[in-house]
Amino acid sequence: MNIRNSLILIISSIFVLSFINGGLTSDPTCVGAPDGQVYLFSSWDFQGERYVYNISQGYLSLPDGFRNNVQSFISGADVCFVKWYPSEQYQITAGESHRNYAALTNFGQRMDAIIPGNCSNIVCSSK
């Protein structure tokens, strides 16, 4: 009986500690971004500062802390990631995410803006 109670206590402690440390809920891709939103992170693996973009914002020139510094992202919307000079663009679809976007394509280190919808919606670059 003592061994059984000890095992229950140990397992319960591990379970509680994993919740406290975020071990069971630490992966934001399990939840994803809400519909119509994109989460941008300043560090890889969904860490660091987080910027929440909502498609109702329309065209968005990234804030200084994220311009040329999108290390990871989770998308709940179809959006276009844009670099104006030289012109580059990447179509991102709802449900897409990258833990280390800057290293994967190196585009996160060059990104200037977000536009809702498809990259084909871009007519010309802003000057």
From Swiss-Prot:
**GO CC annotations, alphabetized:** extracellular region
Give the signal peptide, or none: 1-25
Q: Which UniProt keywords apply?
A: Glycoprotein, Secreted, Signal, Sporulation
Keyword Cell membrane assigned: no
Q: Sites of glycosylation?
A: 54, 118
Q: What biological-process terms (Gene Ontology) are attached?
A: spore germination; sporulation resulting in formation of a cellular spore
State the superkingdom. Answer: Eukaryota
Q: Where in the cell is it found?
A: Secreted
The family this protein is said to belong to: Belongs to the Dictyostelium gerABC family.
Q: What is this protein called?
A: Spore germination protein 3
**Organism field:** Dictyostelium discoideum (Social amoeba)
The opening ranks of the lineage are: Eukaryota, Amoebozoa, Evosea, Eumycetozoa, Dictyostelia
Encoding gene (name): gerC
